[in-house]
């Protein structure tokens, strides 16, 4: 078990309306200092399909995709004890200052990528924000029961239901 501190800056603009939250960056994401960096993680391809866009390949393209659709991206946790990338191993979770992030934008909806991030958000952050979260299926390769197309369909349905960006 390793003590991990979140060091990746959130992707956000003052126009962001929907905040997408993971739990804590994986070792590969921490190594590359960018979100969902593990090559088997399907977040970026699923989000691009959901938004009817080509899959971004560079960090700059990924940031542009998020901002173009008035989204924001961060993680629930600032620090925790964790084994590898196993969300189920998390101990001593400390949340990021999500209320302060929300205050600098137009965020009015929160999406969590998986049940662990949703559980931690609901317990540690919701009491301050009062914004309930919607749970997206985990994009992790460990969620093998869902094909990429299924993930994209769920992401699209949820984002379209929440966002004025599609109006």
Regions found by a protein language model. Name each.
Residues 2-17, 39, 84-99, 122-167:
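C-terminal capping/extension of enzyme domains
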Residues 17-23:
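Short, hydrophobic/glycine-enriched beta-strand segments
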Residues 25-28, 78, 117, 140:
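Short, glycine/serine-rich, charged loops/turns that create anion-binding
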Residues 28-89:
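Short, surface-exposed acidic-centric catalytic microdomains
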Residues 41, 117-118:
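Alpha-helix N-cap/helix-start and coil->helix boundary motif
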Residues 45-49, 100, 104, 123:
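Residue-level signal for well-ordered alpha-helical scaffold segments within enzymatic catalytic domains
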Residues 68-116:
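Internal catalytic-core helix/loop-beta-alpha segment
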């Amino acid at each position: 078990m390793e003590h991990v501190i979140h060091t990746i800056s959130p992707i956000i603009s003052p126009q962001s309306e929907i905040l997408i939250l993971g739990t804590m960056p994986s070792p590969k994401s921490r190594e590359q200092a960018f979100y969902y960096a593990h090559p088997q993680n399907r977040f970026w391809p699923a989000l691009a399909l959901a938004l009817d866009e080509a899959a971004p390949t560079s960090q700059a393209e990924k940031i542009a995709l998020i901002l173009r659709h008035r989204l924001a991206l961060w993680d629930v946790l600032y620090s925790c004890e964790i084994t590898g990338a196993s969300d189920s191993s998390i101990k001593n979770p400390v949340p990021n200052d999500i209320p302060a992030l929300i205050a600098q934008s137009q965020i009015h909806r929160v999406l969590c990528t998986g049940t662990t991030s949703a559980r931690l958000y609901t317990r540690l952050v919701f009491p301050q924000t009062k914004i309930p979260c919607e749970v997206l299926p985990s994009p992790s390769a460990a969620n093998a029961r869902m094909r990429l197309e299924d993930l994209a369909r769920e992401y699209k349905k949820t984002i379209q239901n929440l966002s004025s960006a599609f109006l």
